[in-house]
Design a protein with these regions (language model features):
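Second-shell residues forming the walls of enzyme active-site clefts
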Residues: 14, 20, 41-59, 64, ...
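Short, conserved phosphate-binding/catalytic loop or strand-edge motifs used
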Residues: 124-135
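Short, flexible, mixed-charge acidic loops at enzyme active sites
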Residues: 76-85, 132, 173
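A generic, well-ordered mixed alpha/beta core segment in the N-terminal half of proteins
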Residues: 83-115
């Protein structure tokens, strides 16, 4: 059980640059992480990105998750080398499920071309305020549960048909957050009944069709009143008792980025790693402080065997569903990218489509990660 290649499977790590330097390659070869998450800092050109992903796969003894946030709009890492897809709000306001289906299909196709096998979406949070300063602006599929369920399910089904796995986020829902978890810990002071009426409905509806769930960094007194300022991503009550037991979810569960301020400012690194796995997460996500993945691995090695075994089984089961990358073709990439631009024009109109998403300086710069 304490086999190095297996314990590393519980880690989803970022990558420092646009290519694997010798030190990073040595670290990953030794650690054997379960997966890698890429950001704008890793993307320079189509050919470079495919080579980076091929290199990550080549040094892995067990096929890794290769993941990214490719939602649409400002949270579209691939817009650095291609077209920016419309975001969830723009598509929902168009009110055409055929366009959402097309968005899902094209997202799956372009990701598979590069070798990504898991996309960290759909967002299942509701939008209570489209202008809220909580990182969700433009990213939500609806303002009520039924709208989110209808639209997110359409996107999710279409993307998965193309062979790319999905992750519903941000469980159990942080639409009511008044601050951005990238910077500080939101407190969602709602009753469980209120959560069930709104935030939890999309998760309940889509659970059977999601390949994984991402837990969020918000505090919920209705579950953890005895642990003030304890994030949901580390909560046994929310993940172990509610998600695993009450909702009977047996699939893969991962944390959101443990480098966010909502966790960094509240809990030590060692306690964070220990708590997130003991709570019921299978993957601990470390996006930016890549130099700490060895320390995380050491902490994981101290955890009880039954906890590690259950996580490894869920990881292995999910990985069996991963599809292989398409053979690389720059011409095929350009063909898919042209269709993404056409979708943007159909959604926004030709003139509006030319205006790409920008940050207003008040929101979290999630697309720059």
């Amino acid at each position: 059980m304490k086999d190095r290649a297996r314990l590393g499977q519980l880690l989803l790590t970022g990558v420092p640059g646009k290519e694997l330097d010798p030190e990073t390659a040595k670290r990953f070869r030794k650690l054997q992480p379960g997966g890698y998450i890429l950001f704008g800092r890793n993307i320079e050109s189509p050919e470079q990105l495919r080579k980076l992903i091929d290199d990550l796969r080549d040094l892995s003894e067990i096929e890794p998750f290769i993941t990214i946030d490719q939602e649409g709009g400002r949270v579209s890492r691939l817009r650095l080398i291609g077209s920016e897809p419309p975001n969830a709000q723009q598509l929902r306001e168009k009110a055409d499920l055929k366009l959402i289906d097309e968005h899902g299909r094209l997202t799956g196709q372009v990701l598979r071309m590069f070798g990504f096998n898991l996309d960290l979406c759909p967002v299942l949070d509701l939008s209570f305020d489209d202008e809220a300063d909580n990182s969700l602006k433009g990213r939500c599929w609806g303002t009520n549960p039924d709208e989110v369920i209808r639209n997110a399910a359409t996107f999710n089904k279409a993307m998965r048909r193309e062979g790319v796995l999905s992750s519903g986020k941000h469980f159990p829902g942080y639409a009511a957050a008044e601050v951005d978890p990238h910077h500080e810990l939101p407190v969602i002071d709602k009753t469980l009944e209120e959560m069930e009426e709104l935030e939890l409905r999309p998760f309940r509806a889509l659970l059977p069709d999601l390949d994984s769930i991402m837990t969020c960094h918000s505090h919920y007194p209705c579950w953890d009143a005895d642990r003030p300022r304890w994030p949901a991503s580390l909560s046994k009550n929310i993940i172990g008792q509610f998600l695993r037991n009450q909702l009977a979810y047996e699939g893969l569960v991962m944390t959101d980025d443990l480098d966010m301020g909502a966790v960094l400012n509240e809990v030590t690194f060692e306690e964070t790693i220990e708590a997130c796995i003991e709570a019921g997460n299978d993957l601990a996500m470390i996006c930016h402080r890549v130099e700490l993945v060895e320390k995380a691995d050491e902490v994981i090695a101290t955890l009880p065997d039954p906890i590690l075994y259950d996580a490894l089984v869920r990881i292995e089961k999910t990985k069996k569903k991963m599809a292989s990358p398409y053979p690389w073709s720059i011409d095929r990439f350009r063909e898919i990218d042209a269709k993404i631009w056409d979708l943007r024009v159909k959604t926004l109109g030709e003139e509006q489509a030319k205006i790409l998403s920008v940050e207003d300086g008040k929101r979290s710069p999630v697309e720059l990660y």
